[in-house]
């Protein structure tokens, strides 16, 4: 990994992730109505992770632009939670998306183990 870059509040202007970006979110808990979204993590696969620490205003136009860009595929594992949290707290419809958990369930029908650790272990070794 080349590094981790922490951004407070929003991504900097002009940051380009290319045609695909991996996305993960962190929240204060798992309750969509109660627990605030606190962090969005993004990586284009170049070895750098961009962490956006959000405040409760969710005033992050650059981050929202990336997450709603129709020309950028957003890659998630268990997208249902992340997409719902972003809709609830940021007010955006994140699209287009690809969920590796759903892909695993469709392609790996011989198992019921579709967590990120199990999928990564089998695919990446």
Annotate each PLM feature.
Residues 1-118, 122:
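Conserved RNase H-like, two-metal-ion catalytic cores of nucleic-acid enzymes
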Residues 125:
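Nucleic-acid-contacting surfaces of polymerase cores and analogous helical-repeat interfaces
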């Amino acid at each position: 990994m080349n590094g981790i870059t922490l951004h407070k509040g929003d991504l900097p202007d002009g940051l380009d992730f290319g045609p695909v970006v991996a996305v993960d979110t962190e929240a204060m808990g798992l309750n969509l109505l109660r627990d605030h979204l606190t962090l969005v993590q993004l990586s284009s696969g170049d070895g750098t992770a961009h962490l956006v620490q959000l405040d409760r205003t969710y005033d992050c136009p650059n981050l929202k632009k990336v997450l709603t860009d129709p020309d950028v595929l957003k890659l998630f594992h268990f997208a249902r939670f992340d997409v719902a949290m972003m809709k609830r707290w940021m007010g955006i419809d994140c699209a287009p998306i690809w969920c590796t958990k759903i892909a695993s369930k469709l392609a790996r029908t011989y198992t019921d183990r579709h967590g990120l650790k199990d999928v990564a272990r089998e695919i990446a070794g």
